[in-house]
């Protein structure tokens, strides 16, 4: 299939509107609120139902700030020094340039939990357990939004693969990586009102003429938006030119999202020591992310690193080591167990 999803759930004007990406975060926080409220009622482990709203606010801020700073630190440090005359002025705040990083979001949530625990005298490890079991739901919605946006695309796959997807967004990278293929877009750009001679002239000049370069990229984006708006002629014309790819975003939605959530939720049906669920999340997420990255293209400006691994895989390996340490420390601690959610277990904290 040729990807033709519009990133806007509701486009109000131009680039202003309600995006699926924003809705995915909202859905993640709403689901987290509902589930944490339910757990707080059953477990009675120090977080009252009345406190859940404030806690979710802390977690949301930690997720957003940590996710963005994580991307800038791990994948785009040049954004710290990038300033523009237009809003939002600073590259760090321009979330449309690179987006968010899940590893950074995890760090942000940890800091948010520690701050909340200190202010409201709640067990910090219990808070980490709560976000560990609910966080994957947000990851699920986020990865679905990644797919709708046509970002974080998968690696090339066999054209006969039944789930193969072709992303028109690939053509935006052609000027810098596969310029020779630009001339093949003649029948495509003609479907959006750009003539053959005009397009070939832009292709000839874009390397040294800034105006031609801007117009060329504007035409490429026009093609993508036209396909998203239902231009079947452009969609059919571009299909043979695109590389079939794994729907890695959907793989991640299932693996990093649903699979981890179901496992941790099932695991917490019985009493566990504070931090046990969080440590399990760190370990499992690291493993699943390493596997998922085998189907996902690395960031173009970073590429593959040592041993043929991606930046995300190396970060996940480091995360796995941290998870092992946390598991050993937290499970050996002489702490009270937190009740599980399954009926029949005591709502009081039990000593092991």
From Swiss-Prot:
GO molecular function: phosphatidylglycerol-prolipoprotein diacylglyceryl transferase activity
Primary location recorded for the protein, binned into one broad class: membrane
Cellular location(s): Cell inner membrane
Leader peptide range in chain numbering: none
S-S bridge residues: none
Keyword Protein biosynthesis set for record: no
The protein's annotated pathway: Protein modification; lipoprotein biosynthesis (diacylglyceryl transfer)
E.C. number: 2.5.1.145
Membrane topology of this protein: Multi-pass membrane protein
GO biological process per UniProt: lipoprotein biosynthetic process
UniProt cross-references to InterPro entries, sorted A to Z: Lgt
Assigned GO CC terms: plasma membrane
Residues reported to bind a 1,2-diacyl-sn-glycero-3-phospho-(1'-sn-glycerol): 143
Keyword Transferase (UniProt): yes
Listed transmembrane segments: 20-40, 55-75, 97-117, 122-142, 248-268, 275-295, 314-334
Keywords for the protein's UniProt record, in alphabetical order: Cell inner membrane, Cell membrane, Membrane, Transferase, Transmembrane, Transmembrane helix
Pfam families associated with the record: LGT
PANTHER family, A to Z: PHOSPHATIDYLGLYCEROL--PROLIPOPROTEIN DIACYLGLYCERYL TRANSFERASE, PROLIPOPROTEIN DIACYLGLYCERYL TRANSFERASE
HAMAP family: Lgt
Physiological role: Catalyzes the transfer of the diacylglyceryl group from phosphatidylglycerol to the sulfhydryl group of the N-terminal cysteine of a prolipoprotein, the first step in the formation of mature lipoproteins.
Similarity remark: Belongs to the Lgt family.
This protein's name: Phosphatidylglycerol--prolipoprotein diacylglyceryl transferase
Organism of provenance: Bdellovibrio bacteriovorus (strain ATCC 15356 / DSM 50701 / NCIMB 9529 / HD100)
Gene giving rise to this polypeptide: lgt
């Amino acid at each position: 299939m040729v990807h033709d999803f519009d990133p806007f759930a509701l486009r109000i004007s131009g680039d202003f509107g309600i995006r699926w990406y924003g809705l995915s975060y909202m859905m993640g926080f709403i689901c987290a609120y509902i589930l944490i409220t339910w757990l707080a009622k059953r477990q009675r482990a120090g977080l009252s139902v009345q406190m859940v709203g404030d806690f979710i606010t802390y977690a949301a801020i930690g997720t957003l700030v940590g996710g963005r700073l994580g991307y800038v630190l791990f994948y785009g440090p040049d954004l710290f020094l990038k300033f523009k005359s237009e809003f939002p002025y600073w590259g760090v705040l321009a979330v449309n340039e690179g987006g968010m990083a899940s590893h950074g979001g995890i760090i942000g949530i940890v800091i948010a939990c520690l701050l909340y625990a200190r202010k409201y005298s709640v067990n910090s490890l219990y808070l980490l357990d709560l976000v560990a079991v609910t966080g994957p739901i947000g990851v699920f919605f986020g990865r679905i939004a990644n797919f709708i946006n046509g970002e974080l695309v998968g690696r090339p796959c066999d054209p006969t693969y039944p789930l193969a997807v072709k992303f028109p967004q690939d053509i935006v990278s052609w000027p810098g990586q596969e310029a020779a293929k630009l001339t093949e877009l003649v029948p495509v750009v003609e479907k959006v009102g750009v003539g053959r001679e005009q397009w070939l002239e832009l292709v000839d000049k874009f390397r040294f003429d800034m105006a031609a370069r801007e117009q060329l990229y504007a035409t490429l984006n026009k093609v993508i938006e036209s396909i998203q708006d239902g231009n079947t002629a452009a969609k059919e014309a571009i299909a043979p030119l695109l590389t079939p790819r794994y729907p890695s975003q959907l793989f991640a939605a299932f693996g990093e999202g649903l699979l981890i959530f179901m496992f941790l939720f099932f695991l917490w049906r019985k009493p566990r020591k504070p931090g046990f669920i969080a440590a399990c999340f760190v370990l499992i997420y690291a493993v699943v992310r390493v596997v998922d990255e085998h189907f996902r293209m690395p960031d173009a400006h970073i590429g593959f690193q040592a041993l043929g691994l991606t930046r995300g895989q190396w970060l996940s390996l480091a995360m796995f080591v941290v998870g092992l340490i946390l598991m050993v420390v937290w499970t050996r601690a002489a702490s009270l167990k937190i009740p599980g959610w399954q009926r029949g277990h005591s709502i009081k904290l039990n000593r092991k």
